[in-house]
Amino acid sequence: MSEDRTGHQGISGPATRAIHAGYRPDPATGAVNVPIYASSTFAQDGVGGLRGGFEYARTGNPTRAALEASLAAVEEGAFARAFSSGMAATDCALRAMLRPGDHVVIPDDAYGGTFRLIDKVFTRWDVQYTPVRLADLDAVGAAITPRTRLIWVETPTNPLLSIADITAIAELGTDRSAKVLVDNTFASPALQQPLRLGADVVLHSTTKYIGGHSDVVGGALVTNDEELDEEFAFLQNGAGAVPGPFDAYLTMRGLKTLVLRMQRHSENACAVAEFLADHPSVSSVLYPGLPSHPGHEIAARQMRGFGGMVSVRMRAGRRAAQDLCAKTRVFILAESLGGVESLIEHPSAMTHASTAGSQLEVPDDLVRLSVGIEDIADLLGDLEQALG
């Protein structure tokens, strides 16, 4: 979807955009929610006479189009494309923006799935990469080569919660003729809008906070660059990694409450981080909302809240990390994040196992918490009993 055709261009508030952008009440029925258009093909008024531009569901579907308009609106972008997963969106972005012989700069604590795709798949096609600590702008600049076409940013990163200065990296990318993509999954558009800070592309696993209920898998790319969007659209259609209409509906349903949920996620996560910071079993707490976090000032400047993700390192090492994961009752031991329920995991053995033995290897004493929107007393009580 390349524009908001719904008459909501004048809406400025993020919560209002999340609720209203992308769809207006149906003129025939008055339905206030977008219908689930469960059709694989669309009738034509004569050869080539498309109704609303729809011909085949892989190419376009009205429910998906409404979601794409909503996603563009909440990121304050001109164009958005929805995908069947965050990794499908990642794959599309890399194929659209890189060619054999090109080079990409990535975080030295990137998401394991992103690292695996670049390291195990794109290197087969002679795409080179350099992991670097994105908080160190001098290191980022030194990593850029004449073949660098893309700087891949996560902020906060998964799972070490590092913070990168989006504006500074975007300026560096402009100076060195490299595009800047920001994976905004951890912050969500409710807390951070990278396009406004100078990024060229924003990526989401909409499975996480945007969907928000652990019941749908999806991804998205948002940009103001029409040429890039055309390439994304070509690959979206050509490769076919698109969400079905029910997936698009569920994602759009979740998006409506995103701003409200992120407020509660952030409040709860801050309380959890402060509690864990004072616990003797914990050696360090990684949460950008803590003043002790090295990226706190940058996060406070470019985010409207610090999010719902907290990572901790256990003083007694790997066994203590695994024990904590095993003993919680409210926090559910599971991969993924961003749902209303609280989750706990051991990244080195779960989501980031693919980084083992690499520069991106995750410490085995690390526990990642996706702090949900439950009552904070129950969350703190659960962690207290699990820590003993």
UniProtKB/Swiss-Prot annotation:
CDD domains, sorted: CGS_like
Instruction: List the keywords (alphabetical).
Output: Amino-acid biosynthesis, Cytoplasm, Methionine biosynthesis, Pyridoxal phosphate, Transferase
Q: How is the cofactor bound?
A: Binds 1 pyridoxal phosphate per subunit.
A Gene Ontology biological process noted in the UniProt record is: L-methionine biosynthetic process from L-homoserine via cystathionine
GO cellular component terms, alphabetically, are: cytoplasm; cytosol; plasma membrane
Highest taxon of the source? Bacteria
Q: Which cofactor does it need?
A: pyridoxal 5'-phosphate
Chief subcellular location equals cytoplasm
Gene3D superfamilies in the cross-refs: Aspartate Aminotransferase, domain 1 (3.90.1150.10), Type I PLP-dependent aspartate aminotransferase-like (Major domain) (3.40.640.10)
What are this entry's molecular-function GO terms? cystathionine gamma-lyase activity; cystathionine gamma-synthase activity; pyridoxal phosphate binding
Q: Name the PROSITE patterns for this protein.
A: CYS_MET_METAB_PP
Region (Disordered) spans which residues? Answer: 1-24
Where are residues bearing N6-(pyridoxal phosphate)lysine located in the sequence?
208
Give the pathway listed in the UniProt entry for this protein: Amino-acid biosynthesis; L-methionine biosynthesis via de novo pathway; L-cystathionine from O-succinyl-L-homoserine: step 1/1
UniProt keyword Cytoplasm, yes or no: yes
InterPro entries named in the record:
Cys/Met-Metab_PyrdxlP-dep_enz, Cys_met_metab_PP, PyrdxlP-dep_Trfase, PyrdxlP-dep_Trfase_major, PyrdxlP-dep_Trfase_small
Which reactions fall under this protein's catalytic activity? Answer: O-succinyl-L-homoserine + L-cysteine = L,L-cystathionine + succinate + H(+)
Give the main EC class: transferase
Reported EC number(s) for this entry are 2.5.1.48
Q: Which subcellular locations apply to this protein? A: Cytoplasm
Q: Which PANTHER family does the annotation name?
A: CYSTATHIONINE GAMMA-LYASE, TRANS-SULFURATION ENZYME FAMILY MEMBER
**In which family does this protein belong, per the annotation?**
Belongs to the trans-sulfuration enzymes family.
> What binding partners and quaternary form does the record give?
Homotetramer.
User: What exactly does this protein do?
Assistant: Catalyzes the formation of L-cystathionine from O-succinyl-L-homoserine (OSHS) and L-cysteine, via a gamma-replacement reaction. In the absence of thiol, catalyzes gamma-elimination to form 2-oxobutanoate, succinate and ammonia.
Query: What name appears for this protein in its UniProt entry?
Result: Cystathionine gamma-synthase
